[in-house]
């Protein structure tokens, strides 16, 4: 299962983000492409910080949807009082998620990603900055997703 959200500032931010990722890229990845450091979020890049603040603001809703099989409407109040041991109606701290790693990857035609997961982390996301025509889809547990520029896709990290 995945969750998709559209970033309303993508048309303004994405060209800058693409330039930044292109300048920081360095290490080749298995399957092709180059990626930045996994600590790109610590570089003090204003555009990235703005994007990650928006993504971080979605995490409570995303985690609620993953943890709530009955599809109850999200309300932050249902998670109060928060604690390290949970809290509220659903018995977990919705504000306990932390961004551990963040990187950018660029791919050329013919490059791709080998099947992998991000275990032992709980949530992962991909944000799409630039998708030329013919770009490969994202495949999660045999679910083929055709993202659009400016979309963030959340998924469980063990996927």
List each model region and its residues.
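Non-heme Fe(II)/2-oxoglutarate
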Residues: 1-94
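Catalytic core of non-heme Fe(II) oxygenases with the double-stranded beta-helix
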Residues: 87-159
